[in-house]
């Protein structure tokens, strides 16, 4: 349905019966079977399923890579504002492959190909898929940005236990004990290992994975299913899925080397001001309450209170 003919999200939310799940997707694609750079999707369970613990509601939004360069700080600010506005359990942001909303399974082979080609920093699997929405006591993966509610922060050992150097990691508090962690100044798919060699995981992601390992899922339902006649490789077995979940896990001596490699990458300090300014605007536009006090490591760059 064309954008100008589609009902507004607010109308959908208020007109959908309480016992009915709400599923809506808006994309910049020019055809329902095509893929767009921009996407905004909502999956909300009906009241009965929600009260009987049948999974999590999901919000997905995507922008092209160029958006991060042309609108510095906007994406991080929007992600943070959404975390402050909604009762989130967990969330993450980074590189991914947009697939046609109406043809996910038929295009999963392309998602798998790009993830193998460009590196482990590429997310795989439908954010609104069964294996993801059923995760509550664990997270699927680390990424450029990770959001955790208070329960997950405690399960990870507490915010103070995260030994993440502030020059390369933003730690933005939100809500009643929640935490957003940004790993590095920009998302990464991989680090080159040289001609003819598989790409290596980004050091910032490896170290964040090690810090959050207690709450990262070790098992999940399959991340991809494909079609009945598909012969392309996919993450459509539990073994392949579990291997993907551990793609950032390295031997202890290799983790030590990642600390040295991290120090060769750009720091986050100069990017914080743009995020803070945009976040302030979003809070006003969305009517959000006053933010929690600064911890000195967030986007505001202030001193702990």
What is the role of each PLM region?
Residues 1-117:
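Internal, hydrophobic cores of structured domains that mediate oligomerization or house catalytic pockets
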Residues 101-304:
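C-terminal interaction module
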């Amino acid at each position: 349905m064309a954008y100008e003919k589609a009902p507004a999200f607010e109308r959908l939310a208020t007109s959908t019966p309480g016992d009915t799940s709400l599923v809506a997707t808006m994309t910049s694609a020019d055809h329902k079977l095509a893929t767009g750079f921009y996407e905004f999707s909502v999956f909300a369970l009906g009241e009965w399923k929600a009260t009987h613990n049948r999974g999590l509601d999901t919000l997905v939004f995507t922008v092209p890579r160029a958006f991060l360069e042309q609108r510095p700080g906007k994406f991080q600010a929007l992600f943070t504002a959404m975390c402050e506005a909604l009762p989130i359990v967990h969330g993450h942001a980074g590189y991914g492959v947009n697939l046609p909303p109406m043809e996910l399974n038929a295009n999963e082979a392309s998602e798998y190909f790009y993830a193998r080609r460009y590196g482990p920093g590429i997310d795989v699997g439908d954010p609104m898929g069964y294996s993801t929405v059923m995760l509550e006591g664990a997270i699927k993966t680390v990424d450029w940005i990770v959001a955790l509610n208070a329960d997950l922060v405690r399960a990870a050992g507490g915010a103070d236990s995260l030994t993440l150097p502030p020059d390369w990691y933003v730690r933005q508090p939100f809500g009643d004990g929640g935490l957003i962690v940004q790993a590095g100044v920009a998302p990464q798919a991989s680090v080159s290992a040289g001609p003819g060699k598989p790409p290596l995981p980004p050091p910032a992601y490896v170290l964040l994975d090690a810090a959050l390992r207690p709450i990262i899922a070790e098992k999940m339902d399959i991340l991809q299913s494909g079609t009945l006649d598909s012969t392309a490789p996919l993450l459509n077995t539990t073994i392949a899925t579990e291997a993907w979940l551990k793609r950032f896990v390295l031997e202890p001596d290799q983790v030590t080397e990642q600390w040295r490699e991290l120090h060769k990458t750009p720091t986050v300090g100069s990017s914080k001001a743009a995020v803070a300014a945009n976040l302030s605007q979003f809070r006003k536009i969305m009517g959000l309450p006053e933010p929690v006090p600064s911890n000195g490591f967030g986007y505001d760059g202030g001193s702990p209170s």
